[in-house]
């Protein structure tokens, strides 16, 4: 019984670590996406203000925000990539996500450079939405993968709980049989001969 409980606890600890890592991956990727969207929004606002001939200081503030967001997104994405990938499917998904991130990040970098050099036509025709959509597809795939990991961990934990409960009940039944047998044997071999 103790061996089975130890096995279940060890298995649950491994699954808990797996769930924790999955949640960290989800958080890092979600933060990366949020910061990239923040950079994109700042660039779009700066582009609009540039087209409307607003003062350079207003535009410069937005450009600083966009550049800072792009730098922060790189740091966040590196932390995401530093987390170990499990099976071959997850490693392939990680590589695809890395490619789509690099493409989206590069498109935003180019857009910022074009805006800083006042090339509005290049800024407006940058394929940022396409690269963002590609990243979002990978982002959603990660969400599904992490949900799958969480569901599998939950199902396995439930199975371990049921096995532990079955072993515990079995041990109680075996103990009751042993005690009943011992009482019967004591009565048959010790108490009944003394009654004569």
Predicted regions and their residues:
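Alpha-helical heptad-repeat coiled-coil segments that mediate oligomerization/polymerization in large
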Residues: 121-135, 139, 143-167
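N-terminal membrane-insertion alpha helix
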Residues: 2-23, 160-163, 183-184
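Membrane-proximal N-terminal soluble sensing/regulatory segments of transmembrane proteins
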Residues: 11-99, 110-131
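Hydrophobic alpha-helical transmembrane segments of multipass integral membrane proteins
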Residues: 2, 39, 173-177
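Selective recognition of signaling/oligomerization transmembrane alpha-helices
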Residues: 149-196
């Amino acid at each position: 019984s103790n061996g089975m409980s130890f096995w279940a606890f060890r298995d649950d600890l491994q699954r808990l670590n797996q769930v924790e890592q999955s949640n960290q991956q989800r958080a890092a990727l979600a933060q990366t996406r949020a910061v990239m969207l923040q950079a994109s929004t700042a660039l779009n606002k700066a582009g609009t203000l540039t087209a409307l001939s607003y003062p350079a200081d207003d535009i410069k503030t937005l450009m600083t925000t966009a550049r800072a967001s792009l730098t922060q997104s790189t740091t966040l994405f590196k932390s995401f990539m530093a987390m170990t990938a499990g099976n071959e499917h997850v490693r392939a998904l990680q590589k695809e996500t890395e490619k789509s991130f690099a493409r989206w990040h590069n498109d935003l970098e180019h857009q910022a450079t074009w805006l800083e050099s006042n090339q509005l036509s290049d800024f407006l025709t940058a394929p940022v939405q396409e690269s963002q959509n590609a990243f979002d597809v990978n982002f959603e795939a990660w969400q599904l993968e992490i949900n799958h990991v969480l569901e599998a961990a939950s199902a396995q934990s439930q199975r371990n709980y049921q096995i532990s409960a079955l072993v515990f009940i079995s041990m109680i039944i075996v103990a009751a049989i042993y005690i009943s047998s011992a009482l019967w044997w004591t009565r048959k071999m010790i108490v009944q001969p003394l009654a004569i």
